[in-house]
A protein has these predicted regions:
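Conserved short cytoplasmic inter-helical helices of the MFS fold
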Residues: 149-153
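Hydrophobic core of transmembrane alpha-helices in multi-pass small-molecule transporters
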Residues: 25, 90-134
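Helix-loop boundary and gating motifs at the non-cytosolic
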Residues: 2-76, 83-105, 156, 162
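Short helix-loop-helix connector
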Residues: 47-49, 80, 142-147
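Juxtamembrane helix-start elements in MFS-like secondary transporters
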Residues: 50-58, 116, 120, 186
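Intracellular juxtamembrane helix-capping segments at the cytosolic ends
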Residues: 131-146
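Transmembrane alpha-helix termini and helix-breaking/packing motifs in multi-pass membrane transporters
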Residues: 39-46, 74-79, 101-111, 163-188
Length: 188
């Protein structure tokens, strides 16, 4: 049984599919470049000997990402337009903190490693918080602009392309970490 698709959604389907596919593919690539499982622990161990600090990476990220969703979900349902909210939160609160991590590492890693570490955790928390606030609205938006029968292929392709780009990204990260001097190698 095929579900009827709203004419407006059908008219804009190619655009919405392509733009969101590119966005998710590059987010997946970006997250592989700064992997919480490999790159972030390596960075933290260059700033401190504390194993607890390494363990805080997934803890801070998870709490900062999942907890806001509990409160943002109701707000997401009540918004008439999701895109402006998602774009603002995504740009300012989800993505900008990662740029600020780079600057923090560049400026403070050598002389003030504890400050660099604290700023790293603050910005990781801020980025995850931004993602957590935006995620319910983003999924609601995707639910409106992509028909049910296109969502599986959308998520499969976007994650697949992002992961394939991440393989190339892993090579670039490996070369960068090896050939660029610390702390510029992590700040790049």
């Amino acid at each position: 049984m095929e579900q009827e698709v709203d004419p407006f959604v059908q008219k804009n389907l190619r655009w919405n599919f392509a733009v969101n596919l590119i966005d998710i593919s590059f987010i997946t690539l970006a997250m592989s470049l700064i992997s919480r499982e490999t790159i972030m622990p390596l960075l933290v161990t260059s700033l401190t000997d504390s194993k607890i600090a390494v363990g805080l990476i997934p803890a801070i990220f998870s709490i900062s990402f999942y907890l806001p969703q509990l409160f943002a979900a109701n707000h997401a349902e009540s918004m008439k337009r999701k895109l402006p909210f998602v774009m603002f939160i995504g740009a300012v609160f989800e993505r900008l903190p990662y740029v600020l991590i780079g600057f923090s590492i560049l400026l403070f890693a050598l002389d003030l490693p504890l400050l660099a570490l604290v700023l790293f955790f603050i910005f990781i928390g801020a980025g995850a918080f931004g993602a957590g606030v935006a995620t319910p609205s983003w999924f609601t938006m995707i639910g409106k602009v992509l028909p049910v029968h296109r969502r599986g292929i959308f998520f499969g392709l976007s994650e697949g392309f992002g992961t394939m780009m991440g393989i190339l990204g892993a090579f670039v990260v490996g070369v960068t970490l090896e050939q660029v001097a610390y702390p510029l190698n992590f700040a790049t």
